[in-house]
Amino acid sequence: MSLLTEVETPTRNEWECRCSDSSDPLVVAASIIGILHLILWILDRLFFKCIYRRLKYGLKRGPSTAGVPESMREEYRQEQQSAVDVDDGHFVNIELE
């Protein structure tokens, strides 16, 4: 039941909807779109770092590590992770003289 399209009023027996066109296809479509929008917004807020990292850096896996020692692989992974982990809350102020 959408708060924007229906009005509830107390009656003798129970709460009753006074909206006569609630079965209108336009109202149904608007309700479905509203629910989908809410779900997508919640998912975006929950996973925004993962989503935007994927968009920014793509699905690239990096160069092949065949024949590379494990210590160098770990160092490469740490470099890649530190390049991705950017703290957006801090900005650098540069003053030119």
Curated annotation (Swiss-Prot):
InterPro entries: Flu_M2. The keyword Ion transport applies. This is Matrix protein 2. Its main location: virion. The lineage of its organism: Viruses, Riboviria, Orthornavirae, Negarnaviricota, Polyploviricotina. The record marks H37 as: Essential for channel activity, possibly by being protonated during channel activation, and by forming the channel gate and the selective filter. The chain crosses the membrane at residues 23-43. It is a single-pass type III membrane protein. Residues 62-83 are annotated as: Disordered. The keyword Cell cycle does not apply. Residues 44-97 are intravirion. Belongs to the influenza viruses matrix protein M2 family. The modification Phosphoserine is found at S64, S82. HAMAP family: INFV_M2 (MF_04069). The record marks W41 as: Seems to be involved in pH gating. GO terms for molecular function: monoatomic ion channel activity; proton transmembrane transporter activity.
